[in-house]
Amino acid sequence: MGTTASTAQQTVSAGTSLEGLQGGSSSSMDSQHSLGGVQSFRATSLHNSKAKSIIPNKVAPVVITYNCKEEFQIHDELLKAHYRMGRLSDATPEHYLVQGRYFLVRDITEKMDILGTLKSCGAPNFRQVRGGLPVFGMGQPSLLGFRRVLQKLQTDGLKECIIFCVREEPVVFLRAEEDFVSYTPRDKESLHENLRDPSPGVKAENLELAIQKEIHDFAQLRDNVYHVYHNTEDLRGEPHTVAIRGEDGVCVTEEVFKRPLLLQPTYRYHHLPLPEQGPPLEAQFDAFVSVLRETPSLLPLRDNHGPLPALLFSCQSGVGRTNLGMVLGTLVMFHHSRTTSQLEAASPLAKPLPMEQFQVIQGFICKVPQGKKMVEEVDRAISACAELHDLKEEVLKNQRRLESFRPESRGQECGSQQAVQQRALWSLELYFYLLLFNYYLHEQYPLAFALSFSRWLCTHPELYRLLVELNSVGPLVPGDLIAKGSLEADDLVSLDALSTVREMDVANFRRVPRMPIYGTAQPSAKALGNILAYLSDAKRKLRQVVWIFLREEVVLECDGHTHSLWPPGPALAPEHLVALEAQLKAHLSAPVPNTKSPTAPRFQKCLTTQEVFSQHQGACLGLTYCRIPVPDFCAPREEDFDRLLEALRAALTKDPGTGFVFSCLSGQGRTTTAMVVAVLACWHIGGCPEVGEEELVSVPDAKFTKGEFQVVMKVVQLLPDGHHVKKEVDAALDIVSETMTPMHYHLREIIISTYRQAKATKEAQEAQRLQLRSLQYLERYIYLILFNAYLRLEKTSSWQRPFSTWMREVATKAGIYEILNQLGFPELESIEEQPLSRLRYRWQEQSRDPEPCDVGDFL
């Protein structure tokens, strides 16, 4: 091997071999450890028994056997995990830690057993849903306890049963006399919390096997015992020693649940990890549905007249996640029995809870056929499972806490309120996903689950759009937005990349060459007059001007300066924005309370956006003002494209020479996107110019500069004449960008530029923000291509079918939303573990991630 080693005999004992192999004492060991890998002491012992010399080496230990005929290095990935010692306090003994940092703590206590079923049934909080449906829940049983649960189910005449363990944390079972009881690894800093999300891509089952092997190895180092804890609040008498003898001294979850089922083929076990907070992932719903699909007695088959199978859900305490599983199972049983009358009769005292006060629930009822009925069905299912935990009441309780939040100190305000708001959001999001699952059952249960839950959701993108409204946790009260918001003066000078403030009194004013399409930043009343005079002068002679205002924020002009409400709040319809601006104006015009001169208003003159334009309509008779709020950074919504095209077509039908002006805060992102939409629409209405040959681009990664991202080309391949459709969009982007080169690259370049910035930055929060931006820009580019395809394909029918309808009826079936649900840069990195690649998280961030802003005057 080329490795020089001494042949002098070196004694290596079991107690010291680990330090020798690891290259130092435990105190000097590297703090990093592999969750998936565990050091194999038995393998090391085997080598020790044969070894004449073991020489530490930077690559791996070099082992020379006694007969000097064999020399080898141990290239075992498992040896990279360090054995570490630790203790909970100075009064407790030191012992080995699993995975290098965790203590094993018994996770079931008598306090958890609220229903007192541990002794009588074998598991804590064992119960059945009200109404007699065969849906059960329980806490974590021991091995013998689980056998007693099975006996009870069989005694009750249940011939078929599906057992779901819904725990997502690793659990190991250690011998206690003739039984095996559960323990979970916990961090010293959070001894009351189970280990969650150990590492991306690491499954709890694999982690359990690694810990199982570790405990075997630790026991061999410490006289066949290992130290565990029963009470981390009172360390007197802790830790306890558990004898570990042989391979069967430690069991994992699958062994405890599957071994008793070996001789009962009609009883099946599945691991279905569910989160402790918030809703399950689509993949977790898919896993649940796949089990249902494999259960003929649960499917709507013609010859299926047998008894229903039992569904048994188990988590640690049998409350939170178990309750969620029971609600899911109850909804499935509803659809199998086609009636909920038995449950209505079972809970006559369950008072209806006002869930419709939440904007996202209102949106669901409005968008979904029989939406109100589906909400009522979910409420009945929750009530049937509410013996220990009521999910509806949890939503309302969290909302009440949020409304009555009073921090103990100013310094505590931000963190505490954020924690309360996060809990409120999680509970509402969970309730919303139960509604989605019930809607899924309505459509897919009669079809025996032809589509998985995740694929079905991609056929209903309007439901993903509702996620944006989830951030409005409480009822939408305009007065609350005003009371809790602040008024920010718009910064219109530093944004002036095109240096047009000096000439036009407004930032980034520009025109599309050879077309009456203009873009600008937020104008003041004075700047608006200058622009209208410019457009109607002797050179341009525009008789009709349509001004399309794109801001989603509440905007007022106060004493000659534009201001906006911060934070901007949830997305509102144009009419609601107008009403809220009027309400804010009235609020600002009222006397300031608690002042010596109560009649003094905050501003001398205050105008809404509508009033600013109305003042100029007298001087410019051809001016038409249109409010089409569009989200910043990301792609316009499908309905936004509808409104833009409708405004453009109506104006051009009236006067083909109409000029269009688009404006947002900076005159950049939203304005540029709307200008491209206008260019494409005008081309298709008046005739598209010939798109020239593709120019050669001599720069590194030229395909990105040309917009040839892998996901974009995937969309292009689905569209008729897709490459030409993309070329037209690229031509529109180029023509709009001709006069704005100093502002930045055009959209195709800014996608990859922002992606590289995200990879280069070292600050985690900034990296995530830039990653989101790059994906939003990429999605915006794809939507422009889809909109252009719509313009081409629907031209013969004069676009009678709106773009939103076309996306739902055509693009959805083509799989466009499934592509958008895996958005990213697979040619540069894996997108498997990136939540923002999925619609669920990316669209929800539209209202959760406003750009940072300095604090202004509180209202």
UniProtKB/Swiss-Prot annotation:
Query: A Pfam family matched by this chain, by name?
Result: PTPlike_phytase
State the GO CC annotations. cytosol
User: What superkingdom does the record give?
Assistant: Eukaryota
The chain residues annotated with the modification Phosphoserine are S89
**Residues annotated as region Disordered?**
1-34
Q: Which InterPro entries match?
A: Prot-tyrosine_phosphatase-like (IPR029021), PTP (IPR050561), Tyr_Pase_cat (IPR003595)
Q: Identify the tissues in which this protein is expressed.
A: Vascular expression detected in the central nervous system, kidney, lung, heart, skeletal muscle, white adipose tissue (WAT), brown adipose tissue, liver, pancreas and spleen. Not expressed in all vessels: for instance, not expressed in capillaries in the brain, and expressed mainly in large vessels in the heart, WAT, liver, pancreas and kidney. Predominant nonvascular expression in myocardium and lung mesenchyme. In large vessels, primarily expressed by smooth muscle cells, but occasionally detected at low levels in the endothelium. Expressed in various cells of the hematopoietic lineage.
**Where can this protein be found?**
Cytoplasm, Cytosol
Which positions are lipidated as N-myristoyl glycine?
G2
Q: Which cysteines are joined by disulfide bonds?
A: none
Keyword field contains Lipoprotein: yes
Query: What are the UniProt keywords, alphabetically?
Result: Cytoplasm, Lipoprotein, Myristate, Phosphoprotein
Q: Which family does it belong to?
A: Belongs to the paladin family.
Identify this protein by name. Paladin
> Which species does the entry assign this protein to?
Mus musculus (Mouse)
- What is the organism lineage in this UniProt record? Eukaryota, Metazoa, Chordata, Craniata, Vertebrata
